[in-house]
């Protein structure tokens, strides 16, 4: 009987150890891993977008690269996590790269994902091989106010309250009205709106407010890797402002789309893929 009790205790202890030490590390995103190549690409979608935004892009590179496609926690139906913030997400992606021993990946980000790509390359300059920023700026708020300075303690509670107070129809209508200003391809409109509608409202409000407070204009001077900056066609009219924002990024190569809006991968696909191919293969 004594021997039996000892065996039971040993079994329970082993089970406890397996439960504690066998748990996978948590990251503020879901990952879909595809492709099979020695070199890797990490795709970071934009605000409230699904990793599916990269589906067509991935197809062009999966034969030669291992692709890691993220969807951030709380966006597009992915389970939210407590305390979302731009800095936490940046560090989470960097930790994922280190923990999985992904050697010098190419990091491609759209919109807020482009901001994250800049921040990762700036704060972890030895971690990435190249970055591609798809229609993002170092400081979104400075586009309308060049003297903008980010707040050290940024209170996002009002924005969160505003977003969570909307009913389903109000939120859907808001997204339906906003999206045509960001996406010219009507065939993709409902899909992109649906990603927003499926997003967690608290995360939506918190990250909208937090990202608008981000200022990377000085930090990007730390970036050492080659950097391709793809911008929507309208931004050519604001080129002096764009150049000023990016003046500290010495490795930047700027390309302006010929047509379309913020979702360049949908609105000027052939041009977009050509730029990616040329940059990645160089």
Locations of the language-model features?
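Active-site loop/oxyanion-hole signature of alpha/beta-hydrolase fold enzymes
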Residues: 68-108, 112
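Conserved hydrolase catalytic core segment
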Residues: 103-143
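Flexible "cap/lid" loop of the alpha/beta hydrolase fold
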Residues: 131-166
């Amino acid at each position: 009987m004594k021997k039996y009790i000892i065996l039971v205790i040993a079994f329970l202890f082993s089970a406890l150890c397996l439960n504690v030490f066998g748990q996978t590390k948590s990251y503020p995103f879901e990952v879909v891993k595809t492709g099979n190549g020695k070199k890797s690409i990490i795709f970071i979608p934009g605000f409230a977008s699904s990793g599916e935004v990269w589906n067509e892009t991935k197809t062009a590179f999966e034969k030669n690269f291992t692709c890691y496609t993220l969807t951030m926690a709380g966006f597009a139906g992915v389970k939210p996590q407590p305390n979302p913030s731009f800095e936490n997400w940046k560090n989470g992606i960097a930790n994922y790269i280190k923990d999985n021993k992904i050697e010098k990946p190419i990091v491609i980000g759209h919109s807020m994902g482009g901001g994250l790509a800049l921040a990762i390359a700036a704060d972890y300059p030895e971690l990435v091989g190249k970055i591609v920023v798809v229609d993002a700026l170092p400081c979104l708020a400075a586009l309308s106010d060049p003297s903008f300075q980010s707040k050290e303690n940024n209170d996002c509670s009002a924005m969160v309250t505003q977003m969570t107070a909307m009913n389903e129809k109000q939120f859907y209508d808001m997204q339906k009205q906003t999206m045509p200003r960001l996406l010219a391809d009507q065939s993709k409109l409902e899909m992109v709106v649906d990603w927003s509608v499926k997003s967690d409202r608290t995360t939506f409000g918190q990250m909208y407010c937090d990202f608008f407070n981000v200022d990377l204009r000085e930090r990007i001077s730390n970036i050492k890797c080659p950097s391709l900056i793809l911008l929507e066609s309208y931004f050519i009219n604001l080129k002096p402002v764009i150049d000023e924002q990016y003046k500290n990024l010495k490795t930047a190569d700027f390309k302006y789309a010929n047509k379309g809006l913020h979702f360049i991968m949908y609105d000027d696909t052939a041009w977009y893929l050509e730029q990616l191919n040329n940059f990645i293969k160089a």
